[in-house]
Amino acid sequence: MSSSAPSTSAPTKIVIPDLVSHCTIPVRCNRHWKQASVESKRWLFRGGNLSDRKRDAFHGLKAGYLTSMCYPLAGYPQLRVSCDFMNYLFHLDNISDEMNDRGTHGTAVSVLDALYQPHMHPTSRVGKMTKDYWVRLIQTASPGAQQRFIETFDMFFQAVTQQAMDRANGVIPDLESYIAIRRDTSGCKPCWALIEYANNLDLPWEIMDHPIIRGLGEAANDLVTWSNDIFSYNVEQSKGDTHNMIVVVQNQQGLDLQSAVNFVGDLCKQSIDRFHYLRENLPSWGPELDREVEIYVDGLADWITGSLKWSFESERYFGKAGLEVKKTRVVALLPRRA
């Protein structure tokens, strides 16, 4: 009796983990979301610098919907600034994917100059956009939130520049190094500062630097980022992009594709569990500060559940098939581009 040889053909699909069922945090959405979404896209498109194809992609992106689930209690002015930043951040992500490390560095200089010196008059498009939302943000953001925003956005550009160098040199980092740099390339950390801004919080550094508060931010960042690596894997593999945890795990541990997807999915579930554990063990700083901390941690939770819901309703990862993928969890792999 002969046995057939195991198949060595390339996989044609992956089954993504069920992270939605593992996340029991309720979804909330800001009542101003439609108006803020429309006006924010109009702001992004101002000047006609985007092609019709890129404009269509931003309509399908639904960044305003994501923002509205992540900052559900924000007043309209704060939500609008947050929507502008989110559209702008996705715009930066798109253009950084097309840049080498020199181009990324030039963008970083334009952005950080506008943040550190808002009285100056930027000449680049990205510098002007940066100044535009920043001068609105600093009208009501606490000094601590402003400082945390600038510092973490600076870290974002340092990490994105390193990512561009790795991409140019064909470097796939080990898992530990990847996790460290991905926590900054995600862009989540400045979004955590926006939680303070959007909710008019004024949290002191001794609270924001507390190990449990930092751990909660890290757990939320990990879930948002690592789940994004799963959801974006198909598009990225079609372009040959290796800055993805699934590729890193395959390379380091010698796993097949589906096993690597499952591995990253387990890490995502562990990050949700870690968030809940830390949330249940928050210390007390007195009634007034405890209320502000509760609002901040709720904001991190909104990011966890909002990002999961949005990932299937946006067209960024699964095109028009997001809700079908959410139901079946099966993703047909795209062919590699020549």
Swiss-Prot record:
Residue window of motif DDXXD motif: 93-97
Keyword hit for Iron: no
InterPro entries: Isoprenoid_synthase_dom_sf, Terpene_cyclase-like_2
Domain of life: Eukaryota
Alphabetical GO biological process terms: isoprenoid biosynthetic process
Binding site for Mg(2+) 1: D93
SUPFAM superfamilies: Terpenoid synthases
Classification via Pfam families: Terpene_syn_C_2 (PF19086)
Catalytic activity entry: (2E,6E)-farnesyl diphosphate = alpha-copaene + diphosphate; (2E,6E)-farnesyl diphosphate = beta-copaene + diphosphate; (2E,6E)-farnesyl diphosphate = alpha-muurolene + diphosphate; (2E,6E)-farnesyl diphosphate = gamma-muurolene + diphosphate
UniProt family annotation: Belongs to the terpene synthase family.
Protein name per Swiss-Prot or TrEMBL: Sesquiterpene synthase 1
Organism: Postia placenta (strain ATCC 44394 / Madison 698-R) (Brown rot fungus)
